[in-house]
Regions:
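Helix-biased detector of long, well-ordered alpha-helical tracts
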Residues: 1-133
Length: 133
């Protein structure tokens, strides 16, 4: 795994907390955080704003690559139910939940259909499914 953190002004305690969370996720997935980049970009980000990205790369032996030639009638496909928004759903969720043109909720409001606040729902970590398989 490689990570990337960008911000307008580095706050070492915040960066340490972010990297610690990434390391926790790596441990859950049985992956290693091999490196990454931390960028201070005052012209791009306001103080206190962060951009976080990560890339995971795996290796598989050529003989074990799953392709159309290895799929047969009777094979089973497993599906796991999602338990939240996950990494790619937050931009749309923020817009739908917080924008007055849509739901217009406040961060401290209870998320409809749940017992948690909108803020708590938006801050839930993405589930790592590796061990579920």
């Amino acid at each position: 795994m490689l990570d990337y953190i960008a911000t307008g002004a580095l706050a070492p305690a915040h960066v340490e907390a972010i990297v610690s969370g990434v390391c926790d996720g790596c441990r859950q997935a049985g992956a290693a955080l091999l490196g990454g980049e931390t960028a201070e970009l005052p012209g791009m980000y306001a103080d206190g704003h962060y951009d976080l990205a990560a890339t995971a790369v795996g290796v598989v032996e050529r003989a074990k690559i799953l392709g159309p030639d290895r799929v047969q009638v009777g094979d089973v496909v497993l599906g796991l139910a999602s338990d939240g928004l996950h990494s790619n759903g937050y931009s749309l969720a923020r817009k739908a939940l917080l924008d007055p043109a849509y739901a217009g909720l406040q961060l401290d409001a209870t998320l409809p259909g749940s017992d948690m606040s909108v803020a708590a729902a938006l801050l839930r970590p993405t589930r790592i499914y590796v061990k579920s398989m």
